[in-house]
Amino acid sequence: MHQEQNKIIKILFSEYYEKAELDLPNDMELREFAYQPFDSETYVRHLSFSSPQELRQYILQNVPLHLYYSSARYQLPSAKEMDEKGWLGSDLLFDLDADEICEVKVRRFCPQDGYETLASNCNGEPPIEYAEITTECIMKVFEKALLIRDILKEDFGLNARIFFSGNRGFHLRVTCYEDCALLDPDDRKEIAEYFTSPKPPVIYEGNPGWSGRIAKGIEGINIDTQVTIDIRRLVRIPGSLNGKAGLMVVEIKNDKFEYGEWLSPFDGDCIFLPYVSAELTLFNNKYTVKRTYPIKIDTRIGVYLALKGLGKVKAYVR
């Protein structure tokens, strides 16, 4: 991200975290915390906090672009080497992304003139790429998340919470104890394959499980299997901001989800300087931008487009 843009968006993120309600586990002292700073491609890891107040104080001094805690519990979560942490068990995770569920349209723009192109190269430079996610696509992914949640309950007796990722997908999390927590990667791989490649011996509509589902036309679900298998996975903290879009990571309750501007916490308007010339669709609204021509736009939209690399936020007014 551009340094000037970073400064403004970092201020917005910092102001958000002053009052943000982060949904933290009751055993947070057993979790490893991590974050990605602004202007850095690497994570700061092996952090440990004993209270929400201690965490908030830290992130106000070190504003995160992305903020995580571990799905695993550890005896020594701040140990620098993974083998020294003392693994005590992990939650069970599922990750759904629009790329795996929908045919996502990827648009390319040449940085020299901002115009859309079909080429993979613009006079020796890579094009600006923007995956345009539709509301229809997000809702399809949400339907798959609900299906996974229901299957976990019906077939395994497990209760999963669903979270919007803050970008273009959903996470499901089963808080595990005892046998569930101690599942090893091979066990978790079998569970992942149960969802992606169901193979019931008999297909009959009246049967429970995948036998009945396949008979009704329900197919296996494309999930990121590595997320489910990994016992040391970092997960986004509910209530944090996803630095790829500036949207909040939120829990979905009562099976209801609306993909819209409310997912961004920012108020007011901003001056947005586009890098591209195009008509862009976001949250079912269309925005026309022209390269190097500043426009006044809703800050929620400006931050989203800036984090997608389509321009920069020059100023904002509450």
From Swiss-Prot:
GO terms for biological process: DNA replication, synthesis of primer. Catalytic subunit of DNA primase, an RNA polymerase that catalyzes the synthesis of short RNA molecules used as primers for DNA polymerase during DNA replication. The small subunit contains the primase catalytic core and has DNA synthesis activity on its own. Binding to the large subunit stabilizes and modulates the activity, increasing the rate of DNA synthesis while decreasing the length of the DNA fragments, and conferring RNA synthesis capability. The DNA polymerase activity may enable DNA primase to also catalyze primer extension after primer synthesis. May also play a role in DNA repair. InterPro entries: DNA_primase_ssu_euk/arc, DNA_primase_ssu_PriS. HAMAP family: DNA_primase_sml_arc. Heterodimer of a small subunit (PriS) and a large subunit (PriL). It comes from the Archaea. GO terms for molecular function: DNA-directed RNA polymerase activity; metal ion binding. It comes from Sulfurisphaera tokodaii (strain DSM 16993 / JCM 10545 / NBRC 100140 / 7) (Sulfolobus tokodaii). The active site is at residues 95, 97, 224. The keyword Magnesium applies. Belongs to the eukaryotic-type primase small subunit family. Keywords: DNA replication, DNA-directed RNA polymerase, Magnesium, Manganese, Metal-binding, Nucleotidyltransferase, Primosome, Transcription, Transferase. Its EC number is 2.7.7.-. It is an enzyme of class 2 (transferase). Its cofactor is Mg(2+); Mn(2+). This is DNA primase small subunit PriS. The keyword GTP-binding does not apply. GO terms for cellular component: DNA-directed RNA polymerase complex; primosome complex.
